[in-house]
């Protein structure tokens, strides 16, 4: 039996610019960045003091869920709130009716034919929630003691504490709110999570196990514990109080000095083409290629891709083969573009290996300078921007980079472009790589 064709019918990014594709797209075209000094907590003890975040009035979760689900918001961590907001935006953008949109109306997609695959990260608990438990877990010398933690410390955590911070809670809440009863999964592979989730949804629809899926990822590392982990991993730029926060991230720049955290992500509606046609939907693009690989990570910590970009290049080549497209048919690239020197080097090497002399001319779409590194949600943002670019036949502006060696990645204004195929690829902190090929709807 022939595989079903899969299209993107709804976009739901959530970034420092707000909820939905329009605020993000407008900012990308205009060349604006949401990166600014952190206000959610005091960042003075950290070398990096900036991030891209949603303000409190941009995301009021109780206003974004049906009344019947508002009680559940008490056990939603920030990551879950982002995913719920993104899923709601994607559903509305796709013109779907779900239980959350109208509980009295018949759903557009039968619940048992609606899947959900969401990428998530290692969710850090709020420091305030842990303080009492940690305080009572001290030994006589004042140091943390695991025996005290088990005997008395955990008694100071709320009974549902664990259910707030499990990574699969993002998909759990989204599926409950929208009554998605089809195939569901959570993927936790750092920055590759969104792309891997989208690829899994694609395969689920191709083999006929679902007619549509909510897919992508979301994460927030804008809290002291998660921020500290990223600092120890050497991934964050050191910032100065007198510099422009929006100019810190410079992907593929010879002077790139690290990345900046962004909270957010993107969830899209993937749908079988026959389902989309039956309801007269207007897809953004067709998803025609997907591949994943694992880099060998030769260094002791295992945090970065190998310098020659071999694993990344393999993912790109396999995705192109699945799409039936040659490297010469790709019109634009949307890489991770993190501004982390080792990752930039690996991505650059992979691009040059696959595309040869074309690498210097292929335009890039970079999102991290605009919205920060959304980690598990990074690929979801990139796919949403790439799909919108294909629909509008417009390349968004690029920020900050100068002197990219052999790549078309320097800062540039937005412009019209003939985009038939766009390649989106991401490598992760653990060396997982994912590549997706989008094709224009003709």
Predicted segment positions?
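Active-site-proximal alpha-helical scaffold in enzymes
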Residues: 83-96, 167-171, 175-178, 184-219, ...
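Condensing-enzyme catalytic core mediating Claisen C-C bond formation in acyl metabolism
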Residues: 5-9, 36, 241-323, 331-332, ...
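ACP-dependent fatty acid/polyketide chain-elongation machinery
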Residues: 1-72, 94, 274-286, 384-399, ...
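Acyl-CoA/ACP chain-elongation machinery
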Residues: 39, 211-257, 290-307, 335-345, ...
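Glycine-/small-residue-rich "gating" segment that lines the acyl/pantetheine channel
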Residues: 138-157, 199, 203, 218-277, ...
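Conserved beta-ketoacyl condensing-enzyme motif
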Residues: 8, 29-178, 182-185, 218-227, ...
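Short, well-ordered amphipathic alpha-helical segments that serve as non-catalytic structural scaffolds
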Residues: 83-95, 272, 306-324, 350-354, ...
């Amino acid at each position: 039996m022939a595989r079903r064709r899969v299209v993107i019918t709804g976009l739901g990014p959530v970034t420092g610019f707000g909820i939905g594709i329009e605020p993000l797209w407008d900012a990308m075209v205009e060349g604006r960045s949401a990166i600014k000094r952190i206000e959610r907590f005091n960042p003075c003890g950290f070398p990096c003091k900036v991030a891209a975040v949603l303000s409190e009035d941009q995301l009021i979760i109780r206003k974004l869920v049906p009344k019947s689900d508002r009680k559940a918001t008490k056990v939603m961590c920030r990551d879950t709130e982002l995913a719920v907001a993104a899923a709601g935006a994607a559903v509305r953008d796709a013109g779907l009716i779900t239980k959350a949109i109208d509980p009295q109306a018949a759903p557009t997609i039968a619940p048992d034919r609606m899947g959900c695959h969401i990428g998530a990260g290692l969710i850090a608990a709020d420091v305030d929630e842990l303080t009492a438990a940690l305080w009572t877990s001290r030994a006589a010398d004042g140091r943390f003691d695991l025996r005290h933690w088990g005997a008395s410390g955990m008694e100071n955590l709320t009974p549902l504490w664990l259910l707030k911070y499990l990574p699969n809670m993002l998909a759990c809440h989204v599926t409950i709110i929208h009554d998605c009863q089809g195939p569901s999964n959570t993927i936790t592979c750092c920055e590759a999570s969104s792309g891997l989730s989208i690829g899994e949804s694609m395969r689920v629809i191709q083999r006929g196990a679902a007619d549509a899926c909510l897919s992508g990822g979301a994460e927030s590392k804008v809290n002291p514990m998660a921020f500290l982990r990223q600092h120890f991993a050497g991934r964050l730029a050191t910032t100065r109080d007198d510099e422009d926060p929006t100019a810190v991230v410079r992907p593929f720049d010879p002077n790139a000095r690290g990345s900046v955290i962004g909270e957010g992500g993107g969830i899209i509606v993937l749908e079988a083409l026959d389902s989309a046609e039956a309801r007269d939907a207007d897809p953004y693009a067709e998803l025609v290629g997907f591949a994943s690989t694992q880099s060998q990570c030769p260094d002791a910590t295992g945090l970065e891709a190998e310098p020659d970009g071999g694993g990344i290049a393999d993912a790109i080549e396999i995705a192109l083969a699945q799409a039936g497209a040659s490297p010469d048919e790709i019109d634009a690239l949307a890489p991770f573009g993190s501004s982390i020197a080792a990752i930039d080097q690996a991505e650059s090497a992979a691009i040059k290996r696959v595309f040869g002399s074309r690498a210097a001319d292929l335009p890039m779409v970079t999102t991290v300078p605009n919205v920060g590194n959304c980690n598990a949600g990074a690929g979801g943002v990139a796919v949403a921007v790439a799909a919108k670019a294909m629909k509008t036949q417009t390349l968004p502006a690029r920020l900050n980079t100068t002197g990219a060696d052999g790549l078309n990645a320097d800062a540039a204004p937005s412009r019209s472009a003939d985009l038939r195929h766009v390649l989106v690829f991401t490598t992760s902190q653990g060396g997982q790589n994912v590549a997706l090929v989008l094709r224009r709807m003709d």
